[in-house]
Amino acid sequence: MATQISVDPRVEEEVGRGRSRVLVELRLPAGVRPEGEQRQAIARAQDEVLSRLSGTDFTLVRRFASTPFLALEVGPSALAALRTMGDVVVRVIADAVLPPARGSTPRR
């Protein structure tokens, strides 16, 4: 039985209107690894997801080298494809662009 992934309801709603910017959490093998091996595992999982999204309505926004995530903009066909990737995807969450917190940037 394929592992089901979790999809943020906000993503469902936005994709229903067209496209949504999302973070895709990748499923990596369990266990602690040296940093180099961890980065390789992340890159392999990212490559697998991007390969399987080929031909769907997605845009790569960002690959992360040290965290198991991809930032994407997806439409209905890409979200449908992600739902079938329980072997490499844990969840799909909304990626909201937020302004800096007040007081977190230096004054000029």
Q: What are the language-model segments listed below?
A:
Residues M1-R108:
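Autoinhibitory N-terminal propeptides
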